[in-house]
């Protein structure tokens, strides 16, 4: 029997959220609907999820001692990582001491670095993947590029959203790719993965939720990425029945191997009826923001239910929808978005302004959402919304 107490009282059900970005913000809002007391952590103040949590701490999630100090002080019922860069050894110790890490500390550890999850997928589970080699030194890296061949993709094993990722197309790109990967890793310089190019028609995110009633699969999400970072997504992605079945089979295998409860974003390449595993995140996925307008229970609502041990008897899909990221370029700590009366004048449109305190360089600051008769119409709507949006730095 699931029981939730009163926030900020002795009976409170408490969640510590490790990472407070825009995905965490929506998750916190869903937890608040159930009366859960939320403590949000991030490395900078006034992060999006902090703005809707009961309280917050500014801390590096890679600082295991600082993380432990907060956990021991707050004594949460659940520890929910929202970022890859986190002190996984500390999480594993805390789990052994009786704390509940979502989905599990092992899943967080495996997916924090591309080596752990790639070896699990390809070598233990036998899932189809791109050819790959790992390299720890520049010499090993150059040898890996030689073995894999060009063009190839180079990524730090610990990074996300395209940080440190580049494509080696010819000899002159090799040195630059190594340096960029060393500078772009979330946890500093280190090992990289060199991946062979995959010939694919399109890529999808197969959102998969593990809950007390079993495993549920959402309609496939198609997306566009620029330099490894999400720019646009839509649901459902049109695909053959055979490919759809294989996508769910692969997603089921990898999420079962990771274990625990919660939402997983399984990234896959599709070529005809063939499906190739790419990556998995054991948390809400940026491309999955489209579910805020396409489903009765968004990926964030599903994650909240799964974490709390609440049932998910069904998921209602309202119809085709699209999301478009608002990526701002410049320097500002007083960003404003204008002309919103025009942006939202089309039927079946929504937006989320994340409220990030500042931008330096490129930063995703909002998302535009639309439903349509089909995916094409929904994407066109978000395109019109973007044209109408007035960004002021």
UniProtKB/Swiss-Prot annotation:
Annotated ATP-grasp domain residues: 119-308
Pathway the protein contributes to: Purine metabolism; IMP biosynthesis via de novo pathway; N(2)-formyl-N(1)-(5-phospho-D-ribosyl)glycinamide from N(1)-(5-phospho-D-ribosyl)glycinamide (formate route): step 1/1
EC number, as in UniProt: 6.3.1.21
The UniProt record lists the keyword Transmembrane: no
Residues at which N(1)-(5-phospho-beta-D-ribosyl)glycinamide binds: 22-23, 82, 286, 356, 363-364
Enzyme class: ligase
PROSITE patterns assigned: ATP_GRASP
Catalyzed chemical reaction(s): N(1)-(5-phospho-beta-D-ribosyl)glycinamide + formate + ATP = N(2)-formyl-N(1)-(5-phospho-beta-D-ribosyl)glycinamide + ADP + phosphate + H(+)
Gene3D superfamilies the record matches: 3.40.50.20, ATP-grasp fold, A domain, ATP-grasp fold, B domain
BP terms from Gene Ontology: 'de novo' IMP biosynthetic process
Subunit and partners: Homodimer.
Function: Involved in the de novo purine biosynthesis. Catalyzes the transfer of formate to 5-phospho-ribosyl-glycinamide (GAR), producing 5-phospho-ribosyl-N-formylglycinamide (FGAR). Formate is provided by PurU via hydrolysis of 10-formyl-tetrahydrofolate.
Family to which the UniProt record says this protein belongs: Belongs to the PurK/PurT family.
Full protein name: Formate-dependent phosphoribosylglycinamide formyltransferase
């Amino acid at each position: 029997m699931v029981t939730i107490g009163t926030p900020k009282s002795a009976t409170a059900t408490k969640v510590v959220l490790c990472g407070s970005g825009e995905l965490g913000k929506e998750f916190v809002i869903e937890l608040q609907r159930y009366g859960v007391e939320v403590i949000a952590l991030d490395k900078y103040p006034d992060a999006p999820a902090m703005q809707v949590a009961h309280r917050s701490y500014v801390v590096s999630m890679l600082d295991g001692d600082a993380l432990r100090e907060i956990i021991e002080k707050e004594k949460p019922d659940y520890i929910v990582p929202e970022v890859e860069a986190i002190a996984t050894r500390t999480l594993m110790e805390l789990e052994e001491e009786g704390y509940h890490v979502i989905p599990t500390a092992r899943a967080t550890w495996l997916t924090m670095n591309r080596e752990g999850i790639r070896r699990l997928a390809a070598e233990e589970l036998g899932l189809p993947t791109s050819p790959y080699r790992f390299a720890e030194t520049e010499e090993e890296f150059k040898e890996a590029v030689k073995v894999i061949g060009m063009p190839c993709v180079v990524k730090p094993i610990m990074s996300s959203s395209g940080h440190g990722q580049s494509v080696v197309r010819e000899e002159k790109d090799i040195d630059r790719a190594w340096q960029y990967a060393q500078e772009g890793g979330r946890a500093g310089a280190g090992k990289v993965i060199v991946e062979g190019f995959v010939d694919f028609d399109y890529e999808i995110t197969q959102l998969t939720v593990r809950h007390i009633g079993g495993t549920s699969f959402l309609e496939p999400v198609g997306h566009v990425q620029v330099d490894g970072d999400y720019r646009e997504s839509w649901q459902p992605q049109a695909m053959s029945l055979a490919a759809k079945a294989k996508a769910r089979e692969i997603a089921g295998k990898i999420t079962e191997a990771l274990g625990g409860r919660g939402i997983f974003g399984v990234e896959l390449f599709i070529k005809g009826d063939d499906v190739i595993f790419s990556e998995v995140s054991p948390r809400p996925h940026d491309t999955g923001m489209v579910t805020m307008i396409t489903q009765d229970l968004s990926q964030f609502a599903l994650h909240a239910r799964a974490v709390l041990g609440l049932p998910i008897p069904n998921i209602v899909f309202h119809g085709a929808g699209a999301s478009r990221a608002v990526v701002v370029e410049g320097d500002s700590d007083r960003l404003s978005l204008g002309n919103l009366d025009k942006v939202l004048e089309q039927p079946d449109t929504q937006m989320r302004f994340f409220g990030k305190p500042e931008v330096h360089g490129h930063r995703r600051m909002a998302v535009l959402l639309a439903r349509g008769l089909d995916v094409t119409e929904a994407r066109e709507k978000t395109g019109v919304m973007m044209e109408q949006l007035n960004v002021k730095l």
